[in-house]
């Protein structure tokens, strides 16, 4: 292998294969663009974004790691979300969870 070389598998690679997916319409009611990154807890996204936050608790964007989706002012677009995996613990963001997504608290 040459340093920095990529050795890619032939064919398509499906991201998050077999994971549950939900579709959601999201509108930006603000006067500034809003960008949401791939692993941001979508329910805690900018309050200017209009969508059902209860429905998407524990979900993130179904996009490649390190990428994002931008919502321009007044724009409504459909996004696909997938649930967080692993320990399903959320810390930080806007501080609305700060622990297990699966707890009943």
Curated annotation (Swiss-Prot):
GO cellular component: urease complex
SUPFAM superfamilies listed in its UniProt record: Urease, beta-subunit (SSF51278)
Compartments in which it is found: Cytoplasm
CDD domains: Urease_beta (cd00407)
Pfam families: Urease_beta
Pathway(s) served: Nitrogen metabolism; urea degradation; CO(2) and NH(3) from urea (urease route): step 1/1
Keyword vocabulary terms for this entry: Cytoplasm, Hydrolase
GO BP terms, alphabetized: urea catabolic process
The enzyme's E.C. designation: 3.5.1.5
InterPro entries hit by this protein: Urease_beta-like, Urease_betasu_sf, Urease_subunit
A GO molecular-function descriptor: urease activity
Catalytic activity: urea + 2 H2O + H(+) = hydrogencarbonate + 2 NH4(+)
Protein family: Belongs to the urease beta subunit family.
Assembly and binders: Heterotrimer of UreA (gamma), UreB (beta) and UreC (alpha) subunits. Three heterotrimers associate to form the active enzyme.
Protein name as annotated: Urease subunit beta
